[in-house]
Amino acid sequence: MAADGDWQDFYEFQEPAGSVRDQENCNASPEAGAGAHAGGDSFPALASSLEEKLSLCFRPTSDADPPRAAVRPITERSLLQGDEIWNALTDNYGNVMPVDWKSSHTRTLHLLTLNLTEKGMSDGLPFDTSDEEELREQLDMHSIIVSCVNEEPLFTADQVIEEIEEMMQESPDLEDDETPTQSDRLSMLSQEIQTLKSSSMSSCEERVKRLSVSELNELLEEIETAIKEYSEELVQQLALRDELEFEKEVENSFISALIEVQNKQKEHKETAKKKKKLKNGSSQNGRNERSHMPGTRFSMEGISNVIQNGLRHTFGNSGGEKQYLTTVIPYEKKNGPPSVEDLQILTKILHAMKEDSEKVPSLLTDYILKVLCPT
């Protein structure tokens, strides 16, 4: 009987037969479902049970139902909050005081090694703003320069020489060692100039040291722009200097060629005069001989001279005489001096005339067509 009572208690926890059958129908295979459908009325019961389960699972929430808590995602922080080891490590982290560097043993060893001593600020010393203003006025470069200019006016070289001569005349004896000589005075003057330069440089350095970073950047930009402008000006001046030097060389070569041609023309004129004198003397001698020979009107020498003169006029001068040395170069006076190109062309013509070259006519035509009568 005891065994029947135990089984009776066990039967109370079992589900009814219908529910077991429904579970079997749910877990059955498609073939079994197909057989049940073919068998009879089990399919409507299965469909109704499925609808009941779906309605229980997806039933709508009503006001009578208690509110459900929102689903929260599991994060690393939520996991660490429940971790005992993490809590033990982080609970005492904020309670530890930071290390005081000044009172540490490492700091004392550091001071002993570097041999540093801390000097306290003496608050008892009074600070006067008037001293700072006086120092600023003393270091003002503009005021220093203006005061120097007002006190000592600039002297010209002639005034300095006159003053030195007066000092030399006023000195009673040159042999006296106590009176300083001219070289000593000049050396003293140079020393004063050097001291003035050094003081101005030191004051400029102090002013630069007192400038801020922004002011230094502005000063640097101004210096760079000034350097750029001065560089461009220097390039222009160098180019102008080269042009002036080239122009000077062309002018010097033209003047030297002109002087050489003029000297050769003078020599040629002198030789021509001597030849004329000799010819005149020979012609007078021939006339005298002709007067002594009344029967002969023409001589062989006279006929040969006439023939030679005709040939010279027809085919030019003989080989010994200069043909192009006495060439006249046409020149038109303009408002200003001749240009460098004109001087170069004239120099070429003068060199050709000096060498008695055959290029003189072609150079003259080019000069007339390009310079005097340009098309």
From Swiss-Prot:
Top-rank taxon: Eukaryota
Keyword match Coiled coil: yes
Phosphoserine, modified sites: S130, S171, S190
Record-linked InterPro entries: FEZ
The protein's name: Fasciculation and elongation protein zeta-2
Keywords assigned: Coiled coil, Disulfide bond, Phosphoprotein
Subunit structure: Homodimer; disulfide-linked. May form heterodimers with FEZ1. Interacts with synaptotagmin.
Family: Belongs to the zygin family.
Keyword field contains Disulfide bond: yes
Region annotated Disordered, chain positions: 1-42, 265-297
UniProt feature coiled coil, ranges: 156-177, 206-281
Organism annotation: Rattus norvegicus (Rat)
PANTHER family membership: FASCICULATION AND ELONGATION PROTEIN ZETA-2, ZYGIN
One GO term (biological process): regulation of exocytosis
Physiological role: Involved in axonal outgrowth and fasciculation.
GO cellular component: axon; cytoplasm
